[in-house]
């Protein structure tokens, strides 16, 4: 999906993605890249093809529709739909295209079993809740679930999954350990009947910081795209080798003086304390560049950090280029990345008051190009 009729350019560096994947695979050779939500805004198929060429043999996406795009795009290996089959059409698609759906309800078991052809086996991923309280069977559900599976031999659990709630916070490692212990018990229970079932618990933070929770398959997400899930913690150094893979730029429309005492933008929230030079950049909240950055965000122009002045508008934002010589209309202003004093996804998220995941998913909705 792309935001139309704007001037933003999103440039995805596939080489950085590949290097991040290679870094993570050195820690966990069985890493299954998570490329849900259009690969966190980086482009589903280009990212999948790059990582497949780098050695990835399985992927996890969000919806069955995304998984179908991967299959139709020529991705041959295991593809896991993390949201599972949410309706009959999803179930039919999973069975027909060999997509592995997460299963977290008895209704989903029935939908999938009812669509298997005679003699066909349908691979599924059993999703358990070990502390996230989101999707999944409980540990107490396990005996009844195993009985249901035995009664439906066309369904084959190839993966057992759960999700960690605070693996990115070393101060709450006790809860992460409790989740790991619960998952270990669940996995052992499933393997008593299906010994080939693989366990998958570790997300990006656990891949970096909790090798004891790697089990068989790891699911790196945000770390693939160069954001450090352990930033701001005592374990931040574990993600030091990750490289942001997205640059976002917009053209400067005009450069003009702002005399001392003159205000700028809606609401007159900023008044120049001295004679200044401002650049008007062709981006705003209609381009998924948050209005919350008004008066506190920054961009990079000619490799220098420049602060936002006043309110972010629908399609325009003003920045202070007083101390940056030679700025002219047509020059690029970098909202994210770029040369020099580049803003990382984590830094922009701090200014935005959110997390790097949201920054990448939203800005990635703008027109994209891919390069090495």
UniProtKB/Swiss-Prot annotation:
Active site, UniProt feature: 36 (proton acceptor), 266 (proton acceptor)
Cofactor: pyridoxal 5'-phosphate
GO cellular component labels: cytosol
Classification via InterPro entries: Ala_racemase (IPR000821), Ala_racemase/Decarboxylase_C (IPR009006), Ala_racemase_C (IPR011079), Ala_racemase_N (IPR001608), Ala_racemase_pyridoxalP-BS (IPR020622), PLP-binding_barrel (IPR029066)
Signal peptide interval: none
Post-translational modification N6-(pyridoxal phosphate)lysine, affected residues: 36
Keywords annotated in UniProt: Isomerase, Pyridoxal phosphate
SMART domains xrefs: Ala_racemase_C
Residue numbers binding substrate: 134, 314
Catalytic activity: L-alanine = D-alanine
Pathway: Amino-acid biosynthesis; D-alanine biosynthesis; D-alanine from L-alanine: step 1/1
Keyword Plastid in annotation: no
Enzyme Commission number(s): 5.1.1.1
HAMAP family attached to this UniProt entry: Ala_racemase
Family: Belongs to the alanine racemase family.
NCBIfam families named in the record: alr
Protein function: Catalyzes the interconversion of L-alanine and D-alanine. May also act on other amino acids.
Name of this chain's protein: Alanine racemase
Organism of this sequence: Nitratidesulfovibrio vulgaris (strain DSM 19637 / Miyazaki F)
């Amino acid at each position: 999906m792309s935001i139309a009729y704007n001037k933003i350019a999103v440039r995805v560096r596939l080489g950085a993605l590949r290097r991040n994947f290679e870094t993570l695979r050195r820690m966990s050779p069985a890493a299954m890249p998570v490329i849900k939500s259009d690969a966190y805004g980086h482009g589903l198929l280009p990212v999948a093809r790059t990582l497949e060429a780098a050695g990835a043999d399985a992927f996890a996406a969000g919806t069955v529709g995304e998984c179908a795009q991967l299959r139709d795009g020529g991705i041959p290996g295991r593809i896991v739909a993390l949201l599972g089959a949410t309706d009959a059409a999803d179930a039919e698609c999973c069975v027909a295209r060999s997509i592995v759906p997460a299963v977290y309800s008895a209704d989903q078991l029935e939908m999938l079993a009812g669509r298997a052809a005679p003699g066909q086996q349908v691979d599924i991923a059993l999703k358990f809740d070990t502390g996230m309280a989101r999707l999944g069977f409980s540990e107490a559900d396990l005996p009844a679930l195993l009985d249901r599976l035995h009664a439906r031999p066309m369904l084959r659990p190839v993966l057992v999954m759960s999700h960690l709630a605070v693996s990115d916070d070393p101060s709450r490692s006790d809860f992460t350990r409790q989740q790991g212990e619960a998952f270990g018990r669940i996995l052992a229970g499933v393997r008593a009947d299906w010994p080939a079932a693989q366990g998958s618990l570790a997300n990006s933070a656990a891949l970096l910081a909790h090798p004891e929770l790697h089990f068989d398959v790891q699911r790196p997400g945000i770390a693939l795209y160069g954001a450090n899930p352990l930033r701001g913690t005592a374990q931040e150094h574990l993600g030091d080798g990750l490289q942001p893979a997205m640059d976002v730029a917009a053209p400067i429309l005009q450069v003009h003086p702002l005399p001392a005492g003159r205000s700028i933008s809606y609401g007159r929230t900023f008044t120049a304390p001295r004679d200044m030079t401002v650049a008007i950049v062709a981006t705003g909240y209609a381009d998924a560049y948050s209005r919350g950055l008004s008066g506190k965000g920054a961009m990079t122009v000619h490799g220098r950090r420049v602060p936002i002045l006043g309110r972010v508008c629908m399609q325009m934002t003003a920045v202070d280029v007083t101390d940056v010589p030679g700025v002219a209309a047509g020059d690029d202003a970098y909202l994210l990345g770029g040369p020099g004093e580049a803003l990382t996804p984590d830094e922009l998220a701090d200014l935005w008051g959110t997390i790097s995941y949201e920054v990448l998913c939203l800005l990635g909705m703008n027109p994209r190009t891919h390069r090495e």
